[in-house]
Amino acid sequence: MSLCDVHCHTERSACAEDVTLEWYVDIARNTDAVFTITDHSAQLYYPPDNRWAFWGDNPREVFDSCRDEGPARIASYIEDVRAVQTGGMLLGIELDIFIDGTVVCDEDRLGDFDLFLGVAHTFPALRAEADVEEVYDQFQTMVGHLAKLNIDALAHPFRPMRGKGYEISDDLIKWLVDIAGEYDFALEINSHSICRDEDIRMAKLAWEMGVELAVGTDSHRKAEFGDFSYHRE
C-alpha cells in the first residue's frame, strides 16, 4: 500500500538539514511518490535573518514589523514551489497561529495551497511551563482557531506538550478526536519526533470514531523521507 506523506520540509524551514526543494523535485520526476511540501509559515513570514522569532521573546512585535514583507515572502514561496511542481508533489504549508487566532501567514493566500496543516507549536502557557490545566486550555483554544480555518490536518498534536514534560490525558485525546470529527480534519501520526503512547491512544479512538489519520514523516533529513516504518507499525 502506498502512502501520501503530508509533511515534508525544504531549506525554507530553518530546522531542515539536508533536504532541498530541488531534491524533492527530482524525486517527483523520477518516482511515483506522493508527498506535500509543508514549510513553517512563521519561518517563511518572518525575516530571513530572524526565522526563529516566532519562538522567541517578542514574536508579536516582529510579526507586526513585517506585515508588508511577510505576505510578499509567502507569495514568493508559493510561486517558487508552483514553478517546479511536478509528479506527485503537492504544495502545502505548516500553519502557525497566535493564541488569539491571528494567522502567521497571508490569510488571503490560504486557499492557494493544495493542503495545509495546522499546528500548535507554541503558546503562552506552554512557554511559561504553566499548570497542566492552563496548558490544556490554551492548546484547546489554539486547535479551535485552527479548526475554524478548515485545516486539512493537525500536525503532531502532542509533541510540543510532551517536549515540555506534560502528560497527555485520555480526556484531552478524546476532546481532540471529537473536534477533528466535528470539523472534518485529520490527525497526523508524525514519525520525526515520536509520541508512541499518545499516537496509539489517538489512533485507536480515531479508528473507532471514524476520524481520519494523516501520515507525516515531517522530513528534515533525506533519510527520513519515505520511511513509513513507524506508521505501518
Predicted regions mapped to residue ranges:
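Short coil/turn segments at beta-strand junctions that form active-site/ligand-binding loops
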Residues: 33, 87, 211
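Charged catalytic cores and adjacent phosphate/nucleic-acid-binding surfaces used
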Residues: 1-6, 10, 17, 21-22, ...
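Generic macromolecular interface patches on structured domains
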Residues: 16, 38, 89-90
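Hydrophobic residues within beta-strands of alpha/beta enzymes
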Residues: 35-37, 116, 154, 187, ...
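Catalytic domains of carbohydrate-active enzymes, especially glycoside hydrolases
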Residues: 23-41
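Extended substrate/RNA-proximal surfaces in nucleic-acid metabolism proteins
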Residues: 44-182
